[in-house]
Protein backbone atom coordinates (compact mmCIF):
# COMPACT_ATOMS: atom_id res chain seq x y z
CA UNK A 1 0.00 0.00 0.00
CA UNK A 2 1.37 3.40 -0.97
CA UNK A 3 1.41 5.90 1.90
CA UNK A 4 -0.39 9.18 1.33
CA UNK A 5 2.04 11.77 -0.04
CA UNK A 6 1.57 14.13 2.93
CA UNK A 7 3.05 11.69 5.51
CA UNK A 8 6.68 12.01 4.41
CA UNK A 9 6.81 15.80 4.80
CA UNK A 10 5.09 15.49 8.17
CA UNK A 11 7.67 12.97 9.40
CA UNK A 12 10.41 15.24 8.15
CA UNK A 13 9.01 18.18 10.07
CA UNK A 14 8.75 16.11 13.25
CA UNK A 15 12.34 14.94 12.82
CA UNK A 16 13.53 18.51 12.35
CA UNK A 17 11.57 19.63 15.40
CA UNK A 18 13.10 16.87 17.55
CA UNK A 19 16.60 17.67 16.30
CA UNK A 20 16.03 21.35 16.98
CA UNK A 21 14.88 20.67 20.53
CA UNK A 22 17.85 18.38 21.13
CA UNK A 23 20.15 21.09 19.81
CA UNK A 24 18.64 23.67 22.15
CA UNK A 25 18.97 21.27 25.06
CA UNK A 26 22.61 20.59 24.22
CA UNK A 27 23.32 24.32 23.95
CA UNK A 28 21.62 24.96 27.30
CA UNK A 29 23.59 22.13 28.94
CA UNK A 30 26.85 23.48 27.50
CA UNK A 31 26.08 26.98 28.78
CA UNK A 32 25.26 25.63 32.24
CA UNK A 33 28.54 23.71 32.30
CA UNK A 34 30.50 26.85 31.37
CA UNK A 35 28.77 29.15 33.87
CA UNK A 36 28.25 26.63 36.69
CA UNK A 37 29.62 28.02 39.99
CA UNK A 38 32.62 26.49 41.72
CA UNK A 39 30.84 25.33 44.86
CA UNK A 40 33.91 23.73 46.44
CA UNK A 41 35.74 27.09 46.49
CA UNK A 42 33.37 28.23 49.25
CA UNK A 43 35.06 25.85 51.66
CA UNK A 44 37.92 28.37 51.90
CA UNK A 45 36.69 31.55 50.21
CA UNK A 46 33.91 33.93 51.26
CA UNK A 47 31.55 35.00 48.46
CA UNK A 48 32.18 38.54 47.20
CA UNK A 49 28.49 39.06 46.45
CA UNK A 50 25.30 37.07 45.76
CA UNK A 51 22.67 36.90 43.05
CA UNK A 52 20.07 38.40 45.39
CA UNK A 53 22.31 41.27 46.49
CA UNK A 54 23.16 42.17 42.90
CA UNK A 55 19.53 41.91 41.86
CA UNK A 56 18.55 44.33 44.61
CA UNK A 57 21.48 46.65 43.97
CA UNK A 58 20.59 47.22 40.32
CA UNK A 59 16.89 47.60 41.09
CA UNK A 60 16.05 44.20 39.63
CA UNK A 61 13.16 43.60 42.00
CA UNK A 62 11.29 46.61 40.61
CA UNK A 63 12.96 46.92 37.23
CA UNK A 64 14.39 50.29 38.20
CA UNK A 65 17.67 49.82 36.37
CA UNK A 66 19.61 51.93 38.86
CA UNK A 67 22.10 51.37 41.68
CA UNK A 68 20.63 51.00 45.16
CA UNK A 69 22.44 51.12 48.48
CA UNK A 70 23.09 47.81 50.23
CA UNK A 71 23.97 47.27 53.89
CA UNK A 72 26.24 44.23 54.11
CA UNK A 73 29.25 43.35 56.24
CA UNK A 74 30.82 39.90 56.35
CA UNK A 75 31.91 38.51 59.72
CA UNK A 76 33.25 35.07 60.69
CA UNK A 77 30.77 32.62 62.17
CA UNK A 78 32.53 32.94 65.52
CA UNK A 79 31.38 36.57 65.63
CA UNK A 80 27.70 35.72 65.19
CA UNK A 81 25.71 35.09 68.36
CA UNK A 82 24.80 31.47 69.03
CA UNK A 83 21.37 32.88 69.91
CA UNK A 84 20.84 33.87 66.28
CA UNK A 85 22.15 30.54 64.99
CA UNK A 86 19.70 28.67 67.21
CA UNK A 87 16.82 31.01 66.36
CA UNK A 88 17.35 30.57 62.63
CA UNK A 89 17.63 26.79 62.88
CA UNK A 90 14.47 26.30 64.96
CA UNK A 91 12.61 28.74 62.72
CA UNK A 92 13.82 27.71 59.27
CA UNK A 93 15.26 24.20 59.43
CA UNK A 94 15.15 22.22 62.69
CA UNK A 95 16.67 19.15 60.97
CA UNK A 96 19.58 21.16 59.58
CA UNK A 97 22.30 19.09 61.27
CA UNK A 98 20.78 15.73 60.30
CA UNK A 99 19.43 16.05 56.74
CA UNK A 100 21.33 15.88 53.46
CA UNK A 101 20.05 19.21 52.17
CA UNK A 102 16.40 18.28 51.75
CA UNK A 103 13.67 17.85 54.38
CA UNK A 104 10.03 16.73 54.19
CA UNK A 105 9.59 17.99 57.74
CA UNK A 106 10.04 21.58 56.59
CA UNK A 107 7.29 21.07 54.02
CA UNK A 108 4.91 19.89 56.75
CA UNK A 109 5.92 22.81 58.98
CA UNK A 110 5.20 25.27 56.16
CA UNK A 111 1.70 23.87 55.74
CA UNK A 112 1.08 24.04 59.50
CA UNK A 113 2.21 27.68 59.61
CA UNK A 114 -0.04 28.51 56.66
CA UNK A 115 -3.02 26.88 58.39
CA UNK A 116 -2.34 28.79 61.60
CA UNK A 117 -1.97 32.14 59.82
CA UNK A 118 -4.75 31.46 57.27
CA UNK A 119 -2.37 32.32 54.44
CA UNK A 120 -0.68 30.67 51.47
CA UNK A 121 2.11 28.25 52.47
CA UNK A 122 5.58 29.78 52.79
CA UNK A 123 8.56 28.29 51.08
CA UNK A 124 9.61 24.98 52.61
CA UNK A 125 13.27 25.11 51.64
CA UNK A 126 16.04 24.01 53.96
CA UNK A 127 18.82 26.41 54.93
CA UNK A 128 21.07 24.78 52.32
CA UNK A 129 18.46 25.20 49.59
CA UNK A 130 17.93 28.83 50.58
CA UNK A 131 21.69 29.39 50.45
CA UNK A 132 21.93 27.95 46.93
CA UNK A 133 19.10 30.22 45.78
CA UNK A 134 20.54 33.34 47.44
CA UNK A 135 24.06 32.82 46.11
CA UNK A 136 23.39 31.92 42.50
CA UNK A 137 19.74 31.87 41.48
CA UNK A 138 16.57 33.99 41.39
CA UNK A 139 13.23 34.00 43.26
CA UNK A 140 11.59 32.32 40.25
CA UNK A 141 9.88 28.97 40.85
CA UNK A 142 10.15 27.63 37.32
CA UNK A 143 11.07 23.91 37.04
CA UNK A 144 14.52 24.43 35.52
CA UNK A 145 15.47 26.82 38.33
CA UNK A 146 14.29 24.28 40.91
CA UNK A 147 16.37 21.54 39.26
CA UNK A 148 19.46 23.77 39.35
CA UNK A 149 18.76 24.60 43.00
CA UNK A 150 18.54 20.89 43.84
CA UNK A 151 21.88 20.12 42.18
CA UNK A 152 23.61 23.07 43.87
CA UNK A 153 22.12 22.04 47.23
CA UNK A 154 23.51 18.54 46.76
CA UNK A 155 26.94 19.99 45.93
CA UNK A 156 26.93 22.37 48.90
CA UNK A 157 26.16 19.56 51.31
CA UNK A 158 29.06 17.51 49.99
CA UNK A 159 31.62 20.29 49.65
CA UNK A 160 31.03 22.20 52.91
CA UNK A 161 30.55 21.42 56.57
CA UNK A 162 27.25 22.26 58.23
CA UNK A 163 28.94 25.01 60.22
CA UNK A 164 30.32 26.57 57.04
CA UNK A 165 26.92 26.42 55.33
CA UNK A 166 25.33 28.14 58.32
CA UNK A 167 28.11 30.75 58.46
CA UNK A 168 27.66 31.71 54.82
CA UNK A 169 23.87 31.69 55.07
CA UNK A 170 23.82 34.03 58.07
CA UNK A 171 26.17 36.39 56.23
CA UNK A 172 24.15 36.68 53.01
CA UNK A 173 20.46 36.21 53.83
CA UNK A 174 18.17 39.25 53.67
CA UNK A 175 16.93 40.72 56.97
CA UNK A 176 15.12 43.75 55.54
CA UNK A 177 15.07 45.91 52.44
CA UNK A 178 18.68 46.26 51.35
CA UNK A 179 19.95 44.69 54.60
CA UNK A 180 21.97 41.50 54.13
CA UNK A 181 23.71 39.38 56.71
CA UNK A 182 23.59 39.17 60.50
CA UNK A 183 26.15 41.91 61.17
CA UNK A 184 24.41 44.54 59.04
CA UNK A 185 21.03 43.57 60.53
CA UNK A 186 22.27 43.75 64.13
CA UNK A 187 23.81 47.18 63.58
CA UNK A 188 20.83 48.51 61.62
CA UNK A 189 18.11 47.44 64.06
CA UNK A 190 19.90 47.37 67.42
CA UNK A 191 23.10 49.39 67.05
CA UNK A 192 25.26 46.46 68.15
CA UNK A 193 27.37 43.67 66.67
CA UNK A 194 25.91 40.31 65.68
CA UNK A 195 27.88 38.58 68.44
CA UNK A 196 25.94 40.56 71.09
CA UNK A 197 22.38 39.69 70.05
CA UNK A 198 20.06 38.59 72.87
CA UNK A 199 17.59 35.72 72.62
CA UNK A 200 14.73 38.14 71.96
CA UNK A 201 16.63 40.06 69.30
CA UNK A 202 17.71 36.84 67.61
CA UNK A 203 14.10 35.63 67.55
CA UNK A 204 12.98 38.93 66.02
CA UNK A 205 15.54 38.68 63.22
CA UNK A 206 14.81 35.02 62.52
CA UNK A 207 11.05 35.61 62.49
CA UNK A 208 11.40 38.05 59.61
CA UNK A 209 13.25 35.71 57.25
CA UNK A 210 10.14 34.45 55.38
CA UNK A 211 9.04 38.05 54.62
CA UNK A 212 12.02 40.36 55.27
CA UNK A 213 10.49 43.38 53.50
CA UNK A 214 7.47 43.47 55.83
CA UNK A 215 8.50 41.40 58.88
CA UNK A 216 11.39 42.90 60.83
CA UNK A 217 12.11 44.34 64.30
CA UNK A 218 9.69 47.20 64.77
CA UNK A 219 6.95 45.58 62.70
CA UNK A 220 3.53 45.76 64.35
CA UNK A 221 2.18 42.74 62.47
CA UNK A 222 0.41 40.35 64.84
CA UNK A 223 1.50 37.39 62.73
CA UNK A 224 5.10 38.53 63.04
CA UNK A 225 4.84 38.99 66.82
CA UNK A 226 3.32 35.50 67.16
CA UNK A 227 6.20 34.12 65.12
CA UNK A 228 8.74 35.81 67.42
CA UNK A 229 7.14 34.29 70.53
CA UNK A 230 6.93 30.89 68.85
CA UNK A 231 10.65 30.97 68.03
CA UNK A 232 11.51 31.88 71.62
CA UNK A 233 9.52 28.89 72.87
CA UNK A 234 11.17 26.55 70.37
CA UNK A 235 14.62 27.82 71.33
CA UNK A 236 13.90 27.06 74.99
CA UNK A 237 12.82 23.52 74.12
CA UNK A 238 15.72 22.81 71.75
CA UNK A 239 18.40 22.95 74.44
CA UNK A 240 20.43 20.33 72.52
CA UNK A 241 21.25 23.00 69.93
CA UNK A 242 23.52 24.78 72.40
CA UNK A 243 26.04 21.95 71.95
CA UNK A 244 25.95 22.21 68.15
CA UNK A 245 26.37 25.95 67.54
Where is each model-derived feature located?
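Juxtamembrane regions of bacterial inner-membrane/periplasmic proteins
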Residues: 2-245
Amino acid sequence: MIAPPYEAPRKGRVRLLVLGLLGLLAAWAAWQAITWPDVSALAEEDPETTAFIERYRDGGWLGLGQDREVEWKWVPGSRISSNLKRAVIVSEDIEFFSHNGFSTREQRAALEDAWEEKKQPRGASTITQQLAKNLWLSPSRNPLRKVKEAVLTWQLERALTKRRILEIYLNVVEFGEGIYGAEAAARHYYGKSARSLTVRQAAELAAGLPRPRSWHPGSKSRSYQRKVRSIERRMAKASWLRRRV
